[in-house]
């Protein structure tokens, strides 16, 4: 089944294999414009039914790592254009993953020296890379975040929408909103991090308010069936705390996305066993709640494991990462 084609109302993929988004850090940090190395990297992997790009920051303050190609200005969009053209020439399809790192960042990564943005002021007990005195990358603790104001939150929503518009201009077939892995949108979802007492904190609906505002703003620029949203149930990457009620949280979001006609729900579980663990028990609930395509990602070590999830109807596409970058 994994080599069967897949289509929705807007897109057709040659097979059900998606190349998972993987940060590669191959751009120049100054302008964050994709280069020839990035073009060749994606062109070589265009046999995937769908390529989901590495995370592309939607603004300078959205950056959390050195040398990531971005998508907040015309020059960056122009840099992505030959990349998407190369993928299309090989028969592939490509989504841009829109990314705001939030507190997983450092002031040294931002041109204006601004502090990392966060749902709250709770600092991440993890590290990132910043330029050293000699210009070479050095590891350092993530910086102290500042809790976003309501006005700044509105700005973040606008940044995602603008990046989505640029993605279409650059020739991407769609976009993925990165709401997983402990980055900004996931930070707002997490009750252990989000201690806000305004419209963006407290209840589940409030904690997902930012993500859904981003979804709605992006859907004004990109057809909903060309939009994916990534989530990471049970995820604890980047100093996150596991959701206390995952079987409530994620089906709730799936229903909201379904109501909006979103095309893809991307579920990532790091190094998991999709056949036997808790993620497996969640998939029927997600399928009931969401009628678009479900992408399953994480821990697929064999073709048989991929086929099993497809055969059970728990997913429509399988996203894999390491096999696309391992040595032959």
Per-range role (PLM):
Residues 1-328:
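Flavin-dependent oxidoreductase catalytic cores
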